[in-house]
Curated annotation (Swiss-Prot):
InterPro entries: GINS_A, GINS_bundle-like_dom_sf, GINS_Psf3, GINS_Psf3_sf, PSF3_N. This is DNA replication complex GINS protein PSF3. Disulfide bonds: none annotated. One of its GO terms (biological process) is mitotic DNA replication initiation. The keyword Iron does not apply.
Amino acid sequence: MSYYDIDAILTDAEKVPCQFEIDVPYLGHLDNSPNGLKANTPLTLPLWLAEMLALASTPTSNSPLTLNLPPCLSTAVLSALKADPRAVPLRDHSLHFYGVGVRMLDLFDEKDVAEVLRKTFVVRAGDVGLHARKADEGMVGGNGEEFLRGLEEWERGLFRRGHEGVKGAKEWTDKVKKT
């Protein structure tokens, strides 16, 4: 991750559910209340802030915050991905689905989530590659726009690079044929 990587910055800004474990005075504005936050207060925070608070602890106390998996990695979404990764429009769940997933795997020891994310990426990457190769031919099955709308940012980047590679290879072969 680069300091200037826009996708990394936007991934860090994704909201994740969490719960404060202690009373925190003067932070009521996070929950739109005039008072401080009480223990067991649930709210959503940007990933960068929730991660720092969840990992912050002292030798004498626990973390002030418990971090939960975001809605894009809920049981329902993971079940749908297990059934058929191609059928789930990841962009509807999170623009940076894989980025958030990887960050959550850094924080949680969730082998099931890791396996679902891996399988999802492998299966969908094949489709992305096929569509990237056929993009100039009107896309596969005539539903190119719908396919692209369901891709999250990593997949869109993969599509762009794949399409540029196919175009470059075609230009090169045409150039070689002329000489």
